Amino acid sequence: MTAPMDVDNLMSRLLNVGMSGGRLTTSVNEQELQTCCAVAKSVFASQASLLEVEPPIIVCGDIHGQYSDLLRIFDKNGFPPDVNFLFLGDYVDRGRQNIETICLMLCFKIKYPENFFMLRGNHECPAINRVYGFYEECNRRYKSTRLWSIFQDTFNWMPLCGLIGSRILCMHGGLSPHLQTLDQLRQLPRPQDPPNPSIGIDLLWADPDQWVKGWQANTRGVSYVFGQDVVADVCSRLDIDLVARAHQVVQDGYEFFASKKMVTIFSAPHYCGQFDNSAATMKVDENMVCTFVMYKPTPKSMRRG
């Protein structure tokens, strides 16, 4: 039986940790995190595998545990439910505050299920976040591998794709050679850790490549890279105008491909503390016009740790 959840109280403590630099483990206990996962899982399960949402909405790319940068996005655009958001995955790994990041987002999902949408990224898969930081953080901060496992159960229910105003198809990674119709996306099974190969794996892992025509094996060792011709074909076949995806660091936070039929959005500035990239978010207004907000890396003197 899941313990009752006071989502407002948990959100205020998570936000206070972000604003004050307080310690998460003294503010939020493991049972509360487990309850948050369980409640969020039921919300994901109640919604479709292809999230069909209407504008206006803000689309955000990778966050990777950069909690203060997530808060910058809300400060700049507003908080739900005043503003609608669609995040394209990769909430955990690499950054320093993975647990704060994913839990605040799950709280927003629970409290505002029709205003706040989260797709799954490849880092919301156990084989990846076991290695790239999230497992270690759960273990170090809460001394709990069970907590990590409970997060995986929630991640397995996350949708893999979204459709804004019937015209903008969104996913974390990219397209699939097996994708022929939107109904295939509506029928993607959950819960699951997508098998390799599958449409699900491609949605999480595939990348555009300006030097490729058609499909080629991806140097990541998973899925494919695809050319501009593929994007044009898919937009025509699915009757869409734009594909929005994340998954790759781009210098200005956003980058177009295939005559502006695809855009990559990356929302973690100064990624990993090693890149000097800006971040960006994409606003889709009521008329389906897309504009971008950029977030410069914060000066070194302002960065925590």
Swiss-Prot record:
Signal peptide: none annotated. Transmembrane segments: none annotated. It catalyses: O-phospho-L-seryl-[protein] + H2O = L-seryl-[protein] + phosphate; O-phospho-L-threonyl-[protein] + H2O = L-threonyl-[protein] + phosphate. Its EC number is 3.1.3.16. The gene is gsp-3. It holds the Pfam family STPPase_N. GO terms for biological process: amoeboid sperm motility; cell differentiation; egg-laying behavior; male meiosis chromosome segregation; regulation of pseudopodium assembly; reproductive process; spermatogenesis. Expressed in male germline including spermatocytes, spermatids and spermatozoa. InterPro entries: Calcineurin-like_PHP_ApaH, Metallo-depent_PP-like, PP1_catalytic_subunit, Ser/Thr-sp_prot-phosphatase, STPPase_N. Keywords: Cell projection, Chromosome, Cytoplasm, Differentiation, Hydrolase, Manganese, Metal-binding, Protein phosphatase, Spermatogenesis. This is Serine/threonine-protein phosphatase PP1-gamma. GO terms for molecular function: metal ion binding; protein serine/threonine phosphatase activity. It comes from Caenorhabditis elegans. Disruption phenotype: No obvious phenotype. Simultaneous RNAi-mediated knockdown of gsp-3 and gsp-4 results in male sterility due to chromosome segregation defects during sperm meiosis. gsp-3 and gsp-4 double mutant hermaphrodites have egg laying defects and no viable progeny. gsp-3, gsp-4 and him-8 triple mutants have incomplete separation of sister chromatids during the second meiotic segregation. Mislocalization of MSP in activated sperm. In addition, have partial reduction in mpk-1 phosphorylation and air-2 association with bivalent chromosomes in the most proximal oocyte in response to MSP. Mn(2+) 1 binds at D62, H64, D90.
